[in-house]
């Protein structure tokens, strides 16, 4: 073999050995850069989990493997210590670590029984009893509505576990016929039950990840299937988190628009001013006025409102209403005359119906 070909072969061999040692590229699997934040990682997992779930891809023989790779990538990159190990030593450095079930990871985002694709509610068999649904108000800030977030909720969930002994189950009403004599019968209704293994309810700690999507609206619900009240003879109900947006001290939400008030001095109102408003994510919205600003004047800043829930690329407006702070001290006669001379404005005392716009 020629020296040049031998050199190329060795380099290729080293590359292959390195790839095997390095293991899977978890960042590539999740489709995020190595600098990705935990929020980016969670968002990527949630999106891909819906796409790659084996139930959604029954004709793909690699669906299970892809889903397992996705779960492994999330488990490592969502844990700061495991991520540090992975960044330093690759997947080989994690071999001795504990690995979670990928189904457990999935249930943290969607609940115990997965989800119904296409957004349809799960179908309930009328013959199978079902526990009650639980609705929990989840308070979110306007900052979270603007930028999105993942909220971790820890709850103690009652879970049915096997216990010693037997119990009555599947009880139902049945008609019994008793012969009292020739041509005489008596019909009675009795409760008939089957005998089932005994169960007891045990509280187990569950951690759920609720994604607060940008632009989420008050009253929207995020369902977690099978996370509601248990039923010893059937299926548990669902848990639904209902969004409740808390009031903000600076901004008021109306649809996708944000409203706020700015108070300026009388001098600023007359001669103009410049200022910055700190937005919900910390960026500055610059305001520059070189005209007279009247009390109640409004300024529209397009694209500085909240993202639209259905299309985050569309944002509402920021509507700023100006208030003018007049001097609280009385003016001297000399100051009054000076203002009259400066403004050169005579009396304007017009009485009209302001509510009708006349």
UniProtKB/Swiss-Prot annotation:
Contains high-mannose Endo H-sensitive carbohydrates. Cys-169, Cys-171, Cys-193 and Cys-196 form intramolecular disulfide bonds. The preferential partner for each Cys is not known. Residues 1-22 form the signal peptide. Keywords: Chaperone, Disulfide bond, Endoplasmic reticulum, Glycoprotein, Phosphoprotein, Signal. It is found in: Endoplasmic reticulum lumen. GO terms for cellular component: cytoplasm; endoplasmic reticulum; endoplasmic reticulum chaperone complex; endoplasmic reticulum lumen; extracellular space; nucleus; protein folding chaperone complex. InterPro entries: DnaJ-B11-like, DnaJ_C, DnaJ_domain, DnaJ_domain_CS, HSP40/DnaJ_pept-bd, J_dom_sf. Residues 25-90 form the J domain. One of its GO terms (biological process) is protein folding. The modification Phosphothreonine is found at residue 188. Glycans are attached at residue 261. One of its GO terms (molecular function) is signaling receptor binding. Part of a large chaperone multiprotein complex comprising DNAJB11, HSP90B1, HSPA5, HYOU, PDIA2, PDIA4, PDIA6, PPIB, SDF2L1, UGGT1 and very small amounts of ERP29, but not, or at very low levels, CALR nor CANX. Binds to denatured substrates in an ATP-independent manner. Interacts via the J domain with HSPA5 in an ATP-dependent manner. As a co-chaperone for HSPA5 it is required for proper folding, trafficking or degradation of proteins. Binds directly to both unfolded proteins that are substrates for ERAD and nascent unfolded peptide chains, but dissociates from the HSPA5-unfolded protein complex before folding is completed. May help recruiting HSPA5 and other chaperones to the substrate. Stimulates HSPA5 ATPase activity. It is necessary for maturation and correct trafficking of PKD1. This is DnaJ homolog subfamily B member 11. The gene is Dnajb11.
């Amino acid at each position: 073999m020629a020296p040049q070909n031998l050199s190329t072969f060795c380099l290729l061999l080293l590359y292959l050995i390195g790839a095997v040692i390095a293991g899977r590229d978890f960042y590539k699997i999740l489709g995020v850069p190595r600098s990705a934040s935990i929020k980016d990682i969670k968002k990527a997992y949630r999106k891909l989990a819906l796409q790659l779930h084996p139930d959604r891809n029954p004709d793909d023989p690699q669906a299970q493997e892809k889903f397992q790779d996705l779960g492994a990538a999330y488990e490592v990159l969502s844990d700061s210590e495991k991520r540090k190990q992975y960044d330093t030593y690759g997947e080989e450095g994690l071999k001795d670590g504990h690995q979670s079930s990928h189904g457990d990871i999935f249930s943290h985002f969607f609940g115990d029984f997965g989800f119904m694709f296409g957004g349809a509610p799960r179908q309930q068999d009328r013959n199978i009893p079902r526990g009650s649904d639980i609705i929990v108000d989840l308070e979110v800030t306007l900052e979270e509505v603007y930028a999105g977030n993942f909220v971790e909720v820890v709850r103690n969930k009652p879970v049915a576990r096997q216990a010693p002994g037997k119990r009555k189950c599947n009880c139902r009403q049945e008609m019994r016929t008793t012969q009292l004599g020739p041509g005489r019968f008596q019909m009675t209704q009795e409760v008939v039950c089957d005998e089932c293994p005994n169960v007891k309810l045990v509280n187990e700690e569950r951690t759920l990840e609720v994604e607060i999507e940008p632009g989420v609206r008050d009253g929207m619900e995020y369902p977690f299937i099978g996370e509601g009240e248990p039923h010893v003879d059937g299926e548990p109900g669902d848990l639904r988190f209902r969004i409740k947006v808390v009031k903000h001290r600076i901004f008021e939400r109306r649809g996708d628009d944000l409203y706020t008030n700015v108070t300026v001095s009388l001098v600023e109102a007359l001669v103009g001013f410049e200022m910055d408003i700190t937005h919900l994510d910390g960026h500055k919205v610059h305001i520059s006025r070189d005209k007279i600003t009247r009390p109640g004047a409004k300024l529209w800043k397009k694209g500085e409102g909240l993202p639209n829930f259905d299309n985050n690329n569309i944002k509402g407006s920021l509507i700023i209403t100006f208030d003018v702070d007049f001097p609280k001290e009385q003016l001297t006669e000399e100051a009054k005359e000076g203002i009259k001379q400066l403004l050169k404005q005579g009396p304007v005392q017009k009485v009209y119906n302001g509510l009708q716009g006349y």
